[in-house]
């Protein structure tokens, strides 16, 4: 692994705290998105009216925090390991980052494969999180949710929607890493020099690199989220069912019984959450990496 990018512990710690910060700040958006997707007749206004207290907006924060912080730590460590292996012998870096620079197809593949692998590992937490956030299950805690799924559906219940999740997360992550790395190269050239500060070696200062990385993350996440939105709706519907429902069956039901537009339910909320989450998580990740290096 490239020494410039730090060792595995640095990526684990940086990814963990980046993911944790983003989920604590943005959990209300995730909860509203889940409830908006669970029923075809819902509107954001009606979902908000059903929220009884402000505290309820943070329902499911614990499983979300576990999934996102652990998932981010594992994903970013695996992503860096695979990218560093492909970049071995190369010293190419962008001005705002310690991460290795790869060709576009390599960014696409490493992002997609790393996310698919970590997504399967964290799938049980994801299922519990979605059930906990919805209004269809009145769980009083994670232990109760875990026992109920195990007793009623068995081990298979913890991996419900795995195919839809992989079809959503792998393309999203691949597109995101590709776009993110390109944006980090383009933004310093596109922005006025007065907005950017650099040291004697040409590397951007901490405030400038944080701005470039944050804006790059926001823009990349916005586009990747829009393109993969239908898979998110299908995944949520599958995970909320107590009986086995397939990917194709769920897709056919939404398109034929409801309307194709339903596939994009919750997009505005997911767009806000994913874009801001990427901005927070990747911004913290990249800057913590420099401090720990």
From Swiss-Prot:
GO terms (BP aspect): glycine import into mitochondrion; heme biosynthetic process
Solcar repeats: 6-85, 102-186, 208-291
Pfam family, one: Mito_carr
Top-level lineage group: Eukaryota
InterPro entries on file: Hem25/SLC25A38, Mitochondrial_sb/sol_carrier, Mt_carrier_dom_sf
Listed Gene3D superfamilies: Mitochondrial carrier domain (1.50.40.10)
One term of GO molecular function: glycine transmembrane transporter activity
Major place of residence: mitochondrion
UniProt keyword terms in alphabetical order: Membrane, Mitochondrion, Mitochondrion inner membrane, Repeat, Transmembrane, Transmembrane helix, Transport
Catalysed reaction equations from the record: glycine(in) = glycine(out)
Classification via SUPFAM superfamilies: Mitochondrial carrier (SSF103506)
Compartments where found: Mitochondrion inner membrane
GO CC annotations on file: mitochondrial inner membrane; mitochondrion
HAMAP family reported in the protein's UniProt record: SLC25A38 (MF_03064)
UniProt function note: Mitochondrial glycine transporter that imports glycine into the mitochondrial matrix. Plays an important role in providing glycine for the first enzymatic step in heme biosynthesis, the condensation of glycine with succinyl-CoA to produce 5-aminolevulinate (ALA) in the mitochondrial matrix.
PANTHER family hit by this protein: MITOCHONDRIAL GLYCINE TRANSPORTER (PTHR46181:SF3)
Family to which this protein belongs: Belongs to the mitochondrial carrier (TC 2.A.29) family. SLC25A38 subfamily.
Name this polypeptide is given: Mitochondrial glycine transporter
Lineage of origin: Eukaryota, Fungi, Dikarya, Ascomycota, Saccharomycotina
């Amino acid at each position: 692994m490239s020494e410039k990018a730090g060792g595995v512990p640095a990526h684990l710690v940086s990814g963990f705290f980046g993911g944790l910060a983003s989920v604590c700040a943005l959990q209300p958006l995730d909860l509203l998105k889940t409830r908006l997707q669970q029923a075809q007749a819902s509107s954001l206004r009606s979902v908000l009216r059903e929220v009884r207290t402000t505290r309820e907006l943070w329902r499911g924060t614990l499983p979300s925090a576990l999934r996102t912080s652990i998932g981010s730590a594992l994903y970013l460590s695996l992503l860096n390991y695979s990218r560093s292996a492909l970049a071995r012998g190369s010293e190419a870096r962008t001005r705002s980052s310690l991460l290795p620079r790869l060709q576009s197809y390599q960014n696409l593949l490493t992002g997609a494969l790393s996310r698919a692998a970590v997504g399967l590992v964290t799938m049980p937490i994801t299922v519990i999180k979605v059930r906990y956030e919805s209004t269809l299950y009145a769980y009083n805690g994670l232990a109760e949710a875990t026992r109920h799924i195990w007793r009623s559906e068995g081990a298979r219940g913890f991996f419900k929607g795995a195919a839809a999740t992989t079809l959503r997360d792998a393309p999203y992550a691949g597109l995101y890493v590709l776009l993110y790395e390109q944006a980090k190269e383009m933004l310093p050239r596109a922005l006025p020099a007065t907005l950017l500060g650099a040291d004697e070696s040409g590397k951007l200062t901490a405030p400038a690199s944080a701005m470039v990385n944050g804006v790059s993350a926001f823009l990349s996440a916005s586009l990747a989220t829009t393109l993969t939105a239908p898979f998110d709706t299908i995944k949520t519907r599958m995970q909320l069912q107590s009986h086995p429902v397939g990917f194709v069956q769920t897709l056919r039901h939404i398109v034929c019984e409801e309307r194709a537009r339903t596939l994009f339910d919750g997009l505005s909320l997911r767009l806000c959450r994913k874009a801001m989450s990427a901005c927070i998580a990747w911004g913290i990740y990249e800057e913590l990496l420099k401090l720990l290096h």
